[in-house]
């Protein structure tokens, strides 16, 4: 998703500094390039969107923007995924992809390993301590080296993070499933899936038809899940996680019919003390006891 810094104050009195250009198809359709003057409007009076390009104001030396055909980090070819607008690096060993995968895994929406910052992740990947997510739970075996090199900080900081990682082994299995980074499987989908398959290991035996029986899991999502759990490297990684004591089981929950059963809650606009994610979590927790 490409964004261009702007400085605009609209008639509603709000400042607009960014407007999304979505993907290369959208950029091509608009014929927008570097240095162009654009017209921006608020979709639904909320979301800034680019409406058109003022080509009569196009500067000398104008350049069309093109997404690179090689990865800027590892140099491997990039390719567009079938039936999507996503362009990705084709190398399975790309350090940038591994870094983003680990950042997603330890993030709040997944395993929620607090204090595991991006700077630490980048350095641990660069030095070879982390090659996949299972390596995270073996960092304790390198405690002395980590302290000596100061990768996470001094002894106190290192021990604190290692303790947090150890505690994360007890997380509900939906958090682990979210952290795998399977396309189309976010936190909400992971929770729904784990209600149908109470163990991560059950997903290794599930076929596409069984996966599609889960609410909100369509053909594309089912195929992504199936391919992930039938990939030999992923199977080895999951086996390592299990041997390291990472929980594979979902917490048992009781389903109770109520006045809000089957309803969809939509959060829009802004709240003075809560972000969107915090508000969603509050609603979800309240509905558990409704």
Where are each of the predicted segments found?
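Short, charged beta-turn/beta-strand-edge "cap" motif at the junction between a beta-strand
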Residues: 39-48
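Conserved small/polar residues in nucleotide/adenosyl-binding loops
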Residues: 3-10, 289-290
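Short, structured beta-strand/loop micro-motifs enriched in basic residues and often containing a Trp
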Residues: 13-25
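Cys/His-rich short segments
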Residues: 48, 52-110
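DNA strand-break repair and replication-stress modules
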Residues: 98, 105, 149-288
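Short, surface-exposed secondary-structure edge patches
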Residues: 24-31, 256-257, 274
């Amino acid at each position: 998703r490409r964004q261009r810094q702007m400085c605009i104050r609209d008639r509603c009195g709000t400042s607009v500094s960014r407007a999304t250009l979505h993907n290369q198809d959208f950029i091509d359709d608009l014929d927008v390039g570097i240095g162009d003057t654009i017209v921006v409007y608020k979709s639904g009076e909320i979301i800034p969107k680019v409406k058109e390009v003022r080509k009569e104001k196009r500067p000398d030396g104008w350049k069309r923007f093109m997404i690179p055909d090689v990865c800027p980090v590892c140099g491997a070819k990039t390719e567009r995924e079938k039936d999507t607008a996503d362009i990705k690096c084709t190398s399975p060993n790309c350090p940038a992809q591994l870094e983003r995968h680990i950042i997603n895994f330890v993030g709040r929406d997944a395993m929620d390993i607090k204090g595991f910052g991006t700077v630490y992740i980048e350095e641990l990947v660069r030095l070879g301590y982390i090659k996949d997510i299972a390596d995270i739970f073996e960092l304790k075996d390198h405690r002395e080296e980590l302290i000596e090199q100061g990768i996470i900080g001094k002894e106190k900081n290192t021990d604190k993070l290692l303790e947090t990682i150890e505690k994360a082994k007890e997380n509900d299995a939906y958090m682990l499933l979210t952290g795998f980074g399977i396309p189309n499987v976010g936190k909400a989908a992971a929770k729904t899936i784990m209600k149908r398959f109470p163990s991560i290991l059950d997903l290794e035996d599930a076929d596409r038809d069984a996966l599609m029986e889960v609410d909100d899991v369509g053909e594309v999502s089912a195929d992504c899940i199936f391919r992930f759990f039938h990939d030999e490297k992923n199977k080895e990684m999951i086996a390592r996680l299990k041997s390291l004591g990472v929980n594979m089981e979902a917490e048992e929950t009781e389903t109770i019919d109520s006045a809000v059963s089957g309803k969809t809650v939509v959060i829009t606009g802004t709240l003075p003390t809560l972000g969107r994610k915090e508000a969603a979590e509050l609603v979800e927790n309240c509905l558990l006891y409704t």
